[in-house]
């Protein structure tokens, strides 16, 4: 299985794709992220080749449909990058209904872009298959579903894979009454999309295109209890470039004084202390060799990432929503020290450093019908693609 599964399609670099292709002729990357060619036509392209590839695997017995309904407990054992803590995130893979947001069952927390949806729609139209799970959160503070998953995990897993990041993925199966018990416990749960907004909205559009196609109203999902101790969100820091050098950083720091208390700090420890204290919005700024702490003068309980986008990037630096969307001045980076190093080496004019948002903040925003700025959440680790495939 380790030679067949991949990271999610939007996390696969060209180098990773090359490595996946070398591992096995049956690696899923051939379906979810094929290589375009200079001679591609409407009759021969990445999407037609993906469809042909999947059909060949099914016809040749490489892939076989599981005839017994069930759900698949899916545990991920990992090391939290920022703390070094060893954790297990527990969830299960199953089919979930594709519901309009207006129904109040499935909730989003991000806006989507048209480009990724167009690409995934073409793949879905050609393959009629969902090859990657959507990552969904559900509320279960009592842990009733987790208890059933724990019981199933006492047996040997059906599959165990260690990925390139050292994450160990294990999958089991629950059938019969056990699966029905989980269905019953999940029947009234609201769902929050953690990862996979573009693919969820692609599935919505595909359902609309194919009202008579059996199974088009469902998609494969991994469900994780939002109260699970293994659920982690990492911060995604903002790297800024292409600002007018004649007024940066001096002009920016002076202007920021009207909105924030701007304090030079000696180390990241002071920033982490401000985050731990749980006071007003505290944003770090690494500019060259200097570090600054920006504390909101008039905190209103807004998310730090929203304050950064609206009042720092937008108001003070003139990087509006369209520029953010087009990434004209902005790059994103995981890892506090790595982001600071970008500023210190001059690879970025500034690195703005954010405290990770909490699951509670994401849920409160989403269930209230709101959305967060792009790349506000980085749920870690990512779900492995290729563990299950849902063929319509």
Language-model regions, residue ranges each:
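Surface-exposed, charge/polar-rich loops and edge strands
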Residues: 1-392
